């Protein structure tokens, strides 16, 4: 789950706050639409090391204005889109521990990745992934990147392979 570009202005949206109902509904409809049209990869949650099973304090709300952040109780809050509905597959990033043999090592949760036994569905490699670099880093055009944005394409690829073998399967 990656909050690099979470749905402003809150990292966690509260279903009980009337002012946030329209935003939650819009996100929910967009995800339903995407689900009905096939596999979609959204890397939009953040590398906040949050426990999605037990959200407590939202330190980045609202995050649009520097210095305007306020802490608020977000128990029962929703991190959009990862926690929005059952059609969303929430991905956590994992990595090989430093200095271990890839053939025998056990993967560990990447230190930046969000987590939760009931709110994260799958884990995929997300640390030190060889990838194309952003356009502003043109020399060289490839390098190592880390983040759940690196893990979610792995999960989407597996979902696409499963869909190829089982075309009758749905996102549910």
Describe the function of each predicted region.
Residues 1-133:
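Catalytic-core segments of hydrolase enzymes
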Residues 1, 124-172:
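Hydrolase catalytic cores
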């Amino acid at each position: 789950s990656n909050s690099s570009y979470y749905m402003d202005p809150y990292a966690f949206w509260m279903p009980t706050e009337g002012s946030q109902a329209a935003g939650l509904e819009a996100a929910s409809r967009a995800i339903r639409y995407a689900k009905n049209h096939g596999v979609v990869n959204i890397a939009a949650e953040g590398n906040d090391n949050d426990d999605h099973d037990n959200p407590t304090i939202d330190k980045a709300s609202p995050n649009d204005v520097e210095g305007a952040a306020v802490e608020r109780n977000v128990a029962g809050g929703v991190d959009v889109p990862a926690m929005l509905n059952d059609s969303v597959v929430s991905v956590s990033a994992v990595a090989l521990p430093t200095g271990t043999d890839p053939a025998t090592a056990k993967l560990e949760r990447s230190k930046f990745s969000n987590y939760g036994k009931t709110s994260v569905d799958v884990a995929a490699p997300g640390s030190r992934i060889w990838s194309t670099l952003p356009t502003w880093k043109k020399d060289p055009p490839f390098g190592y990147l880390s983040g759940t944005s690196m893990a979610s394409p792995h999960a989407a690829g597996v979902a696409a392979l499963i869909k190829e073998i089982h075309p009758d399967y749905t996102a549910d």
